[in-house]
């Protein structure tokens, strides 16, 4: 799937939110953390990722275009919080107490670990699997692990192994 071009107004709104959150954090933490690099190269079902060593935030342009306001309000501060925790505390658990504190007390945003965006447009092919109680869909990666005998996946409801078909 080709990555969509993001309108400049959306890119500006993302950058504005990033700068507002960063300024707020620098003020509350009495620091002068630099602005991270912002790129729109995240693919798949992840809304964004924070790359600590390169001090970079990668955002998913497809999910951004489909969920502009919520994405800017939640995903941008979420990823920035990861970088700020790394700068302020060093390497910590990705969604640990330091990250939660950074989100809620410093940035003033609810600390949610996952997004609730519709994923139909970014989800790849899936393979049907079933157990005793329901039908399931496995991603290509998980399906290939089953085929190679590297993994067995179980139903979260009944605990039975998932079987292809």
From Swiss-Prot:
Domain of life, per UniProt, equals Bacteria
Keywords, in A-Z order = Cytoplasm, Metal-binding, Zinc
Quick one: where is this thing mainly located? cytoplasm
Gene name, per UniProt, is sprT
What GO molecular function annotation could you give as one example from this UniProt entry? zinc ion binding
Cofactor(s) of this protein: Zn(2+)
Q: Which Pfam families match?
A: SprT-like
Residues given in the record as Zn(2+) binding sites? 78, 82
The name of this protein is Protein SprT
Origin organism lineage? Bacteria, Pseudomonadati, Pseudomonadota, Gammaproteobacteria, Enterobacterales
- Where does it live in the cell? Cytoplasm
GO annotations of cellular component type: cytoplasm
